[in-house]
Amino acid sequence: MVKVGVNGFGRIGRLVTRAAFTSGKVEVVAINDPFIDLNYMVYMFQYDSTHGKFKGTVKAENGKLVINGKAITIFQERDPANIKWGDAGAEYVVESTGVFTTMEKAGAHLKGGAKRVIISAPSADAPMFVMGVNQDKYDNSLKIVSNASCTTNCLAPLAKVIHDNFGIVEGLMTTVHAITATQKTVDGPSGKLWRDGRGAAQNIIPASTGAAKAVGKVIPELNGKLTGMAFRVPTPNVSVVDLTCRLEKPAKYEDIKKVVKQASEGPLKGILGYTEDQVVSCDFNSDSHSSTFDAGAGIALNDNFVKLISWYDNEFGYSNRVVDLMAYMASKE
């Protein structure tokens, strides 16, 4: 089992660690976070307002974080080049600070003995992989990769199924997205993106997202055919993608449902879900799928123009894919 270090113990860092323990697919051996001391790590890992209390045991012992009896080395370095991942036995590093997202910056982890780095965010220059879509393009020569964004992980599997079966001529995506840490609790300054600085709990905030364009990077045939935007809404977690697209081959909505259901039970099992239930966002909290197609919510204007709806837990679903990508990479060593 591959040994993993986590850099940045925020929402994704903590949930990747949870996903590692619940899935048993990778082993977390080290965590670096200069802003959180050990006792605070215990508290933050144990208690989670969104996903509930951790079901195992967590304690601090001999300067280490001990989860379910497993001792994890703690570092508190600001500069990633100074983290001694090798000494802790970490082979792969999850870069989840949201700060070191380029090849050059994330590459600093390699100096401390890490063999590979997985960026838990979109990257300007690192190759992006979406499980269920293009992981087969991964090869051993790649030291630094990106797991793309939570929204790309929701959209890409659905877009792949639709494109493979009916062909997507062009499409627009909207994600109705839960609040994340980059937003403000009350109105405040926000650099160039003025709207993003408005109170997160009070507003529906139009925002930009590169998630749809990024699908073109993981499915090259869709490059230039998709773009999208986001509405940030006052919910703590779980988001939903609306993909409105023009189809090459005419299809009845029932045909679309059928192929998505087949994919969800076959090649994309565990990644793409399918439901005909009358669900709402809450129902997907702590769901580990990348994307769950809502058969009852979509609509068709005609056989070539459809609106498709898919839900995702933008925290936990994504964190599980980070773990899956690492397990997949380890299988290719």
From Swiss-Prot:
UniProt-annotated location(s): Cytoplasm, Cytosol; Cytoplasm, Cytoskeleton; Nucleus
Residue numbers carrying ADP-ribosylcysteine: 150
EC code(s) of this entry: 1.2.1.12, 2.6.99.-
Binding site for NAD(+): 11-12, 33, 78, 120, 314
CDD domains attached to this UniProt entry: GAPDH_I_C, GAPDH_I_N
Residues where S-nitrosocysteine is found: 150, 245
Chain positions with Phosphothreonine modification: 73, 151, 175, 180, 182, 209, 227, 235
S-(2-succinyl)cysteine, modified sites: 150, 245
Keyword Zinc-finger: no
N6-malonyllysine: residues bearing it: 192, 213
Binding site for D-glyceraldehyde 3-phosphate: 149-151, 180, 209-210, 232
Homology family: Belongs to the glyceraldehyde-3-phosphate dehydrogenase family.
Annotated protein name in UniProt: Glyceraldehyde-3-phosphate dehydrogenase
Naturally occurring in which organism (per UniProt): Cricetulus griseus (Chinese hamster)
